[in-house]
Amino acid sequence: MKKALFVLNPASGRQNFWNEVEGIIGCLVLNGIINQVDVAYTKQRYDARAATASLRYGQYDFIVAVGGDGTVNDVVNGVIKSGSRIPLAILSVGLENSFADSLRLPSGKEDFCQMIKAFKTVAVDIGRINGQYFINTVAGGIGTDLSYRADGETKAVLGRKAYFLEGLKTLPLNRSLWQKKH
C-alpha cells in the first residue's frame, strides 16, 4: 500500500473540482492502491512549493499536484529543493495544463486511478533559470505578463478567454519594433 500527498490549489481554473478529487481518492483507497492520504491546500502563490520543500525520501510514495501548470511548477520546485525525489502525478484542473496535456495524462476518475495503480513513472527533463526550476516551458514577454495580469475572478468566469481579454487590453501598450524605429 502506498502513501500519497495531494497538493491542491482550490483557486485553480475549474473551481468545482473537489467532488472529482474526493472520488479519485475514494477510488484509490477502496481499490487498495493507497492507504494514507494527506492533503495540502494552497492559499497563495508558493504555498505548494512550501508544502513540498521539506519532504523526505520515503515520506510519501508519490505526490499528486491538483491544479494547473502553476501548481505543478511550484510542486516541482519544492520537491527539487527537498531532494526527496518523490514521484509526481498531475491531476489537471487548471485553465492551463499544457504539461499534463502534452503527456496525455488522464483526468477522469477511473483512468487516473488506473494510472496510479500501474505506477509507471516517466523521467522528464528539468530546466533551471535564475534558481527557478521548470519542467514544461520557459517563456517571457507578453505571454508571461498576460498570465499574471489575468486575475482569478476573471479566469473563473471566462476561463481561457481571460488571457485573450488581457491581451486586448495591452494592445495599445505594445508597439512593434517597426513602429519604434519610425
Question: Where would I find each of the regions flagged by the language model?
Answer:
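ATP/NTP phosphate-donor binding region
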Residues: 1-63
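Glycine-rich beta-strand-to-loop/alpha-helix junction loops that act as flexible
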Residues: 10, 66-68, 91-93
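Short, glycine/acidic-enriched loop or turn micro-motifs at the edges of active sites
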Residues: 12, 72, 95
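Short Gly/Thr/Asp-enriched flexible loops that form oxyanion-binding sites at enzyme active sites
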Residues: 71-83
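Catalytic core of DAGKc-family lipid kinases
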Residues: 31, 42, 81-182
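Glycine-rich N-terminal segment of FAD-binding domains in flavoprotein oxidoreductases
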Residues: 62-70, 74, 88
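Hydrophobic packing residues within well-ordered alpha-helices of enzyme cores
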Residues: 24, 48, 75, 99-100, ...
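Short amphipathic alpha-helical segments
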Residues: 18-20, 76-79, 101-103
